[in-house]
Amino acid sequence: MATMAILQRTFSFILIFSIALHLKSLFAMETDSGAELKYLELIHEANEFTPDEEYDYIVVGGGTAGCPLAATLSENYSVLVLERGGDQHSHPNIIRQENVANNALPADDENSPSQAFTSEDGVPGLVRGRVLGGSSMINFGFYSRGDDYFFKNTGIEWDMDSVKTAYEWVEETLVHRPDNVSTWESSVRDALLEVGVLPDNGNTLDHLVGTKVSGSTFDSTGNRHGAVELLNKANPNNLRVIVHATVDRIIFSSSESSGPSVVRVVYHDSHGKSYQVGIRENGEVILSAGAFGSPQLLLVSGVGPSQNLTSLEIPVVHDQPFVGQYMIDNPRINLALMLPFSVVDSGTPVVGITGKGSYIETTSSSTPFTSPVSPLYFPYPYPPVNISMGYFFGKVSNPTSAGSLWLKSPSDVAITPSVRFNYFSKPEDVHQCADAVATYEKILKTKAMEMYKFKDHGGEKYFQIVGRQIPENTSDFESMATYCRKTVTTFYHYCGGCTVNKVVDSNLKVVGIGGLRVVDNSVFTSSPGTNPQATTMMLGRYMGVKIQQERAGSDGDN
């Protein structure tokens, strides 16, 4: 019994440790081509660059939406991008697929490409991108287009032909289709089909109910192609990208007739030196700082609930009660299996989209157990052990549970705001979680999964589940609610805080403020599809085209 207790503790540690290390490429290192690095000519360190006094557009945040947005706007207008992080060559490890898990590990130093924090719900390991290209440079590379529900319910007046064209603009540069999948992924795909997650949709980027293999922003050699490469499509004469430039606040002018309008932004470099830069007539400041950064910048600049701002001694520019509200994160429910034989590390291109709303994704890893705690369980000289693991990740789509964001600091934007998502506060979300777990239960009974069972001394076969066991009765609401709340983790698919028809209008202009727009996931009330990065990059391109069309019409009227 003591031995089993030790093994259980070991397995629990392995679950945490190996999830953090579970994507490693088998491919050799290959350098970026010159064409892919053309955008480097546009990048300047903030402490080495003196900006012009004014630009047509200032994009705050060179992330997943900001890069395609800036590249598009630069076709006809001058654009300045202000990015708080460095570029990928300050963090060369983020380029390779084998380093993905390490990049997602909690990072606390101010120079890391990701910034970690814990939600007020007590869920740890949430991260914000802090690198040019944003979260597209530190994620797992899964690429899939948005779903119909998303497009019908965002409040944005989409032109679906333009949406399709914008997706294709992104995909021709960044997206790769896996030629094949690993043994584990093939087994999971077969199991999903066996339990009725139908039809088999093959290899597609579209969001379709059933089982499919999707795209990836990692190529066949294991190199990442993030949103930063979309800057290669820019007009280099019109675009300047400043890294290690942290925007502190937005400055407004005000008149009784027109209300507040953006005048300029204030930012500082890595040495703490402050700069101010303005916008030209008919220009805009566009926030693309993400679901945490964009509402945070509005709040520190005096746009938000007046009572909260006053309590922090922030001068109120515009009373906007919905800034920081409707914060949503899709809950993730994990099932981890120790496998009886070595497997090839795999990404996440296989997904099952169930008819009940939940999505099932998967990955596998073979992790060397060389952690600092090994000597505690295996006296020296302890043998190296490769732990093979298979994972199921269940995603609750379109959760109805929502929370809010508020400032920890009234002036220091380097401090991530407090955020509470209220995971599983609504019964609809618990039912989706229960559906995902019930699907796991069915999957474990399929022929496709038989090969992953262990045998005990009596010849009985069993799965070695690592972590909390699935409840015996998945139809019991209370036991499932407890299970879901105790096992919840993040899918990193945050949205909200500047939602449409609350903070911004259908054209993503901040209501009541002139010259200010928000273009990123903070305007969404649900995360698009199985993974938001495709739609977030599409949004940047889509809005860049739309803004130019608006501007051309406006200039033509003058």
Swiss-Prot record:
Reported cofactor(s): FAD
Expression by tissue: Confined to nectaries.
Reactions that this protein is recorded to catalyse: (E)-sinapyl alcohol + O2 = (E)-sinapaldehyde + H2O2
UniProt keyword annotation of Ion transport present: no
Keywords: Disulfide bond, FAD, Flavoprotein, Glycoprotein, Oxidoreductase, Signal
Signal sequence coordinates: 1-28
EC code(s) of this entry: 1.1.3.-
Gene Ontology molecular function: any one: oxidoreductase activity, acting on CH-OH group of donors
Enzyme class: oxidoreductase
Binding site for FAD: 64-65, 83-84, 131, 135, 139-142, 247, 492-493, 532-533
Residues carrying covalently attached carbohydrate according to the record: 76, 180, 308, 386, 473
InterPro entries linked: FAD/NAD-bd_sf, GMC_Oxidoreductase-Related, GMC_OxRdtase, GMC_OxRdtase_N, GMC_OxRtase_C
Catalytic center residues: 493, 531
Cystine residue pairs: 433-484
This protein's pathway: Alkaloid biosynthesis
A UniProt-annotated Pfam family: GMC_oxred_N
Function summary: Involved in the production of blood-red nectar containing the alkaloid nesocodin and that serves as a visual attractant for pollinator visitation, including vertebrates such as Phelsuma geckos. The nectar is initially acidic and pale yellow, but slowly becomes alkaline before turning into red within 24 hours. Together with NEC1 and NEC2, facilitates the condensation of sinapaldehyde ((E)-3,5-dimethoxy-4-hydroxycinnamaldehyde) and proline to form nesocodin, a pigment with a stable imine bond. Catalyzes the conversion of sinapyl alcohol to sinapaldehyde.
Sequence similarity: Belongs to the GMC oxidoreductase family.
Quaternary structure and partners: Monomer.
Stated name of the protein: Sinalpyl alcohol oxidase Nec3
Lineage: Eukaryota, Viridiplantae, Streptophyta, Embryophyta, Tracheophyta
Recorded name of the encoding gene: NEC3
